[in-house]
Design a protein with these regions (language model features):
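The AdoMet/dcAdoMet-binding core of the Class I SAM-like
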Residues: 10-12, 43-167, 184-185
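A short, flexible beta-alpha/helix-coil linker loop
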Residues: 35-39, 147-150, 175
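Generic structural signal for well-ordered, non-membrane alpha-helical segments
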Residues: 49, 187, 245-248
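A generic structural signal for alpha->beta connector loops
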Residues: 92-94, 117-119, 172, 198-200, ...
């Protein structure tokens, strides 16, 4: 049930809690509970407010030009900010956003200017189940950006999940992973899982976040050898409003420092009734 809090702001119930859309001029921010989840500028669909999305955009833009076609699977939908931005900046791209919360997906489709399918298709379902059931080689990009109460569900972080992601990608496909780090969240586990499956793994992270000095986002990118130009990505990252740097594979290996990867059996996936 939707509950308006002002002429433009709106609050509503979801399958897993509550959500709020707050407007500031042309910009709308989606909150899930008290956590900012997505931000969209209705006057500029390419606008990306969150730094980690800018980092992912720099990687994708290094591989595909404005007129190039690619297919992207977004595991974690919310307001589909990244899918919408890429749909605008790369007009031939096609996107499937997987959102586990049906009511949230319905409200987002109603209140945000999300392009219709086939440009952006919203699929309701569990991200891992969708990965497990997707035909091999179906996507050029997979973005994992799924959170519940501020943490990524463990069944999306295991070696087996990464194996499914790699199988779902084309041979030169790219897996982009938004990892929380700090406090109880340990992005080293995510990176360790990626390193067991992909030949090339790098990351983009604030040094303070990497040291555990504050909670934040680590963007990991994984692919086959020779797919990405690390120097080109690094140059693009340094031009951002808040410049960033890429952590190269050898430095990332030291950062992980023997952290073990999670496995399905450890996290109880699949559950007995699945």
């Amino acid at each position: 049930m939707a509950r308006s809090s002002s002429s433009r702001d709106i609050s509503f119930d979801t399958d897993f809690g509550s959500a709020h859309i707050r407007w500031d001029g042309p910009r709308a921010t989606l909150f899930l509970g008290d956590v900012e989840s997505s931000a969209v500028d209705t006057s500029d669909p390419t606008y990306l407010e969150f730094e980690y999305m800018q980092h992912m955009d720099a990687v994708v833009s290094s591989l595909w030009g404005a007129q190039d076609r690619f297919r992207a699977l977004h595991v974690g939908g919310a307001a589909c900010a990244l899918a919408c931005a890429w749909s605008s900046s790369h007009s031939q791209s096609r996107h499937v956003a997987v959102e586990v919360d049906r009511l949230l997906a319905e409200q987002v489709r109603e209140h945000f200017p999300i392009p219709k399918a086939p440009q952006v298709k919203i699929r309701v379902g569990d991200g891992r189940a969708v990965l497990d059931g997707t035909r091999e080689g179906s996507f050029d990009v997979i973005v994992r950006d799924a959170f519940a109460s501020g943490v990524t569900p463990d069944h999306l972080r295991t070696v087996e999940c990464v194996q499914r992601a790699r199988a779902t990608l084309t041979a030169r496909g790219l897996y982009l992973v938004n990892c929380a780090h700090g406090g109880a969240a340990n992005a080293r586990q995510d990176v360790a899982a990626l390193r067991e499956v992909f030949p090339f793994v790098a990351s983009i992270q604030d040094p303070k976040v990497g040291r555990g000095g504050r909670r934040g986002n680590v963007v990991a990118l994984a692919c086959a050898d020779g797919v990405v130009d690390v120097d080109e990505i690094d140059r693009a990252l340094r031009t951002l409003a808040l410049p960033a740097r890429i952590t190269r594979p050898r430095d990332l290996e030291r950062w992980v420092a023997g952290t073990p990867a999670l496995r399905d059996a450890q996290v109880g996936y699949p559950q007995a009734d699945e």
